[in-house]
From Swiss-Prot:
GO terms for molecular function: L-threonine 3-dehydrogenase activity; zinc ion binding. This is L-threonine 3-dehydrogenase. It comes from Mesorhizobium japonicum (strain LMG 29417 / CECT 9101 / MAFF 303099) (Mesorhizobium loti (strain MAFF 303099)). One of its GO terms (biological process) is L-threonine catabolic process to glycine. The record marks 152 as: Important for catalytic activity for the proton relay mechanism but does not participate directly in the coordination of zinc atom. The keyword Metal-binding applies. PANTHER family: L-THREONINE 3-DEHYDROGENASE (PTHR43401:SF2). Belongs to the zinc-containing alcohol dehydrogenase family. One of its GO terms (cellular component) is cytoplasm. Homotetramer. It is an enzyme of class 1 (oxidoreductase).
Length: 344
């Protein structure tokens, strides 16, 4: 094996991403070296491509980006005993410290010292990736590569959707991006009564409808208050999944929640915004922030879901070779694509 590989690198502190030759990652005794088969482009990768304020203060340059992947074990350190060369794997993109209070209590997703693959340390947009063995997740034979490549965002959706009991509940999802659509489909799979998704992007709403989300609402043309009676809803939504990061959507959600409703918040807002906290108080709402995936319960649950009733393959709208990476980033930056999967 050559000690050099091709990789997509954030090589300059300016918009863009570049294909370069970089050294193959070195592994320590507890690391696994993964030969990448497929990767997917995340919204985080778009932020890094655009070099927005968040990226400028977060990502050191140069950096191999990317954190949505599937591949096979190519090598491993002397202390690794659970994996074998050629085994299909994906992996958790949040590297946690293992020694803080939350890590020691089994709550690794709450680690204060988390490092992000492809953000704070070299990522998956390369021919090889090195991660700690603790972060490696074996992929069952009946899960296709392209589905395993999008487990990171699917995990975000599963973590958000399963934060509260959904059986028999009316669920509002604000934001029909890929993760929002995934969250709506998960809610339907686990027994929600009514599932409504809102957005103002007609392409994304059309994709949500095509994939089988029960009720699709264009918030620029319809008011939720007008839609609810048509669905037989008399009191409000029981559970909200906020996936948009958009102030108007979050305010609509608060307005239409039932008293005692529960909201899981994954969408990241570009800037701070106000909400009416009196409504939160007098409705006695429960708000829960979501970041990443629970380690590793979310992984177990989403693998079980895709082995069963959950089909998210229709969310992949672009399948391209890695040499056409610019086409993939252009599609993601347009805001009108589903998931983009790149073949290495």
């Amino acid at each position: 094996m050559s000690n050099m590989m091709k990789a997509l690198v954030k090589a300059k502190a300016e918009p863009g991403i570049w294909m370069e030759e970089v050294p193959v990652p070195e592994i320590g005794p507890n690391d696994v070296l993964i030969k990448i088969r497929k990767t997917a482009i995340c919204g985080t990768d778009v932020h890094i491509y655009n070099w927005d304020q968040w990226a400028q203060k977060t990502v050191p340059v140069p950096m191999v980006t990317g954190h949505e992947f599937v591949g096979t074990v190519a090598d491993f350190g002397a202390a690794v005993t659970e994996y074998k060369v050629g085994q299909r794997v994906s992996g958790e993109g949040h590297i946690v410290c293992g020694h803080c209070r939350n890590c020691r209590a089994g709550r690794g997703h709450l680690c204060r010292n988390t490092l992000g693959v492809g953000v704070n340390r070299p990522g998956a947009f390369g021919e090889y990736l090195a991660i700690p063995q603790h972060n490696v997740v074996p992929i069952p034979d009946d899960v296709p590569d392209e589905i395993a490549a999008i487990f990171d965002p699917l995990g975000n959706a599963v973590h958000t959707a399963l934060s509260f009991d959904l059986v028999g509940e009316d669920v509002l999802v604000t934001g029909a991006g890929p993760i929002g659509i995934m969250g709506a489909l998960v809610a339907q799979c686990v027994g929600a009564r009514k599932v409504v998704i809102t957005d103002i992007n007609p392409v994304r709403l059309a994709l949500a409808k095509k994939l089988g989300v029960q009720h699709v609402v264009d918030a620029s043309k319809e008011k939720l208050r007008d839609v609810m009676p048509v669905l037989g809803m008399t009191e409000g939504f029981d559970v909200g999944l906020e996936m948009s990061g958009a102030a108007p959507a979050f305010r609509d959600m608060i307005d239409t929640m039932n008293n005692g409703g529960k909201i899981a918040i994954l969408g990241i807002a570009p800037t701070g915004f106000e909400i009416d906290w009196n409504k939160v108080i007098f409705k006695m709402l429960h708000l829960k922030g979501i970041y990443g995936r629970e380690m590793f319960e979310t992984w177990y649950k989403m693998i079980a879901l895709v082995q069963g009733p959950l089909d998210v393959s229709g969310l992949i709208t672009h399948r391209i070779g890695i040499d056409d990476f610019q086409e993939g980033f252009d599609a993601m930056r347009s805001g009108s694509s589903g998931k983009v999967v790149m073949d290495w």
